[in-house]
């Protein structure tokens, strides 16, 4: 989102439709379109900010004590709001974690963010972060997770569940590559719905997981909303597990 000026009207329309359909979590980042995505979101949420759970993310190279504060303030201006519900470190960089967490705590005490968390953190990163001041308040870890990328189920997801840290799953339909898999298409055909709806319904059924599918077109938004009401049968789940088995050993965290 925000990468093409020509696409902005359709992207804004998709966001508005999502809000009208009751999908009120909006995830963005200063990286997306180098701030343009935040500007689009700001235009759409004007006048209805109180209905929305707003998430944004800071670049790792901006995540110093002063840099994160300045980056957050820029995001707030682009979004046209005075606070974020959740502010995440987009991925781990060279700036020490304790410095980033200190900045997040400063922003929280100033009322500019309500909670903070991380993105693309593997298990060892989470353990390290939680041991630092402010790390005990981690409110989410946003990671790549879908039927074809189930590596987090071995250790990271159980760790987060045990500590009550929600996992936000990005790319829940595998950037559309997953949707061409014969097994997924077979389940979708049997249920009379799209493969994307099956993939999202599977993810939504996972305990402690919030799916954040990309939706820049209204028809994608409608399909995403419909996935909420779809319950997969034991037969569906068995077929999906056979085609996309859970991990038997630890694998490195996948990232996009």
Predicted regions and their residues:
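Short, acidic/polar
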Residues: 5-18, 64-79, 126-127
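Acidic (Asp/Glu)-rich catalytic clusters
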Residues: 19-20, 42-50, 73-82, 105-108, ...
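A short, structured active-site edge motif that brings together acidic residues
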Residues: 51-63, 86-90, 120-123, 143-145
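Active-site groove signature of glycoside hydrolases
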Residues: 79-95
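Beta/alpha (TIM)-barrel catalytic core signal, keyed to glycine-rich beta->alpha loops juxtaposed to Asp/Glu
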Residues: 92-256
